[in-house]
Each structure stands twice: as C-alpha cells, then as structure tokens.
Swiss-Prot record:
Involved in peptide bond synthesis. Stimulates efficient translation and peptide-bond synthesis on native or reconstituted 70S ribosomes in vitro. Probably functions indirectly by altering the affinity of the ribosome for aminoacyl-tRNA, thus increasing their reactivity as acceptors for peptidyl transferase. It comes from Rhodopirellula baltica (strain DSM 10527 / NCIMB 13988 / SH1). GO terms for biological process: peptide biosynthetic process. Gene3D superfamilies: 2.30.30.30, Nucleic acid-binding proteins (2.40.50.140). Its main location: cytoplasm. Pathway: Protein biosynthesis; polypeptide chain elongation. This is Elongation factor P. Keywords: Cytoplasm, Elongation factor, Protein biosynthesis. It is found in: Cytoplasm.
Length: 195
C-alpha cells in the first residue's frame, strides 16, 4: 500500500497576516486580511497576498469554509560567509549547509553584510527566496567628512561610508573609526556605539 504524504491546509478561520500559503504552485504571504460579514449571505475573507518569489501582489476573496494549501517554506538562521561573483554565500550554523544566493534575491542586503552577520533565510523547495538582515547592525565608519564645530546641538547630518561600502547619513559628530548602529528596516542611523 502506497501512502501519499498529506499536505497541510489552512481553513479560512486560520487566515491571518503573516501566514504563508500556496496558490497555483507558488508561495504567497498574506499581508492583509479582512473579515467581511454582509447583511445577507455568508461571511467572506478578503486577502491581500505577496508572491514570495516574484514580489507581485494578489487580491483574493474567500468564502467561509474555503481552504488553502500551506506553502512548503522553511525559515532558518544563516551566517554570511563571503561574496562569490554576483552571489552571496551563507551557511546554516546547525546543518553547515551552504547556500549561494543570487544578487536578484539578496537585493540591497550587501549594505549590512560583513563576515559572520546572522540573517534570516526563507527557503522554498530548498532554494533561498528571501534573505533578511537583522533589524540592527553595527558597522565601522571608514570615511566621512569633518564635522563642523558646534554641530552637536543641531540636526546637521553628513554622509558617511561604512566598512561594507554603503553610505548612510549620520550626525555631524560622527568620525572615522566610530562604530554606528544602523536600522535595516528604514536604512537609518540609530546611535553611535563607541566614541
């Protein structure tokens, strides 16, 4: 007797923001979900979803009792090792498996990556589809113009290059050699870590 593997499904009552589902053979993330109960008729669930591979969005409406297949995605913590041409090489610290991630998937993550940076990686059928840096990273300032005397009391900013080659706007008192904390969600300076 051959036993087929069961595929997890989500009923409409399980739908919520952040749920990963499969539609037409591709993984989607529910980004918005609204429950609508009209005066007459059955309840409906209006969902806005993002395709995790292509980045496109999709709007769908489901009736109560409908179900969707769970996406076969796995999220794991990986460490950045090095760049190889246009690819980024990461390693899973638990299994020691290495993943080569193309530039198209990695996007502008290079701004925050130095050796050993831990990132979150989402895999679909064993291939990386999303790589996210930690919310905050600490980077050394390698190049910036001199601050003007008295700038510590005002909101004067200047561009500063960090060890990854990225440029961020920092307060006027930041100097070369300072370690700064950057918020990767909005790409902004948070604070100076050392003097």
């Amino acid at each position: 007797m051959i036993v087929e593997p069961t595929v997890a499904t989500y009923n409409t009552s399980d739908f919520r923001k952040g749920l990963k589902v499969q539609i037409d053979g591709e993984p989607y993330l529910i980004t918005e979900m609204n429950f609508v109960k009209p005066g007459k008729g059955n309840a409906m669930y209006k969902c806005k979803m993002k395709n995790l591979i292509r980045g496109t969005t999709l709007d769908r409406t489901y009736k109560g009792g409908d179900s969707l297949e769970a996406a076969d995605v796995e999220t794991t913590t990986v460490q950045f090792l090095y760049r190889q041409g246009q690819d980024y090489v990461f390693m899973d610290g638990t299994t020691f498996e290495q993943y080569e991630v193309p530039n198209e998937v990695a996007g502008d993550i290079w701004k925050y990556l130095k050796d050993g940076t831990e990132c979150s990686m989402t895999l679909y059928n064993g291939a990386a589809i999303i790589v996210e840096p930690p919310q905050h990273v600490q980077l050394e300032v390698t190049e910036c113009g001199p601050g003007t005397k008295g700038d510590t009391a005002t909101n004067v900013t200047k561009p500063a290059m960090v060890e990854t080659g990225a440029e961020f706007n920092v307060p006027g008192f930041i100097k070369e050699g300072n370690i700064i904390k950057i918020n990767t969600l909005n790409n902004e300076y948070v604070e100076r870590v050392n003097n």
